[in-house]
Amino acid sequence: MKLFKNIVFAIVTTLAFVSTQAQANWMARGNNCYTYSEDGRYQIGISDRSLVVMGQFQCRAHYPMSDTVGINGRVYQALNICSPDMRLIPVISLANTDQAASAIASLKEARRARIRAFNETIIVNTDDIQACANSVAAVR
């Protein structure tokens, strides 16, 4: 049941992030904030409850599975999802509130955060992450 709740939360969070576009700037939308990786292949979304890394390409398999995400050298447990419900867009979600807050703190440690997900190193510019402070408490 907990896995199902995490999947549903990741889907809802992902759909909120998918509905807008931005490039290399942190943008707040409601209680969420998002940006793109430097290469534009990934969208990173944060909220008080989650951190989501979403590929801008289609995945092939249909699965929810346990995974990990590395942020500036710290490793977090995550859920990796590929589902037709999300248009086969691959998503890795930290749906645990404590882990999400810790991961967001890790993001803020460097001007160019290094996220290890999808077997790749994803570079994210965090210079203007403070734009999220009114939307995401962990950024304050």
Language-model-derived ranges and their functions:
Residues 1-11:
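Bacterial N-terminal signal peptides that target proteins for export
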Residues 14-22:
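C-terminal segment of classical bacterial N-terminal signal peptides
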Residues 22-140:
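A generic "folded-domain core" signal
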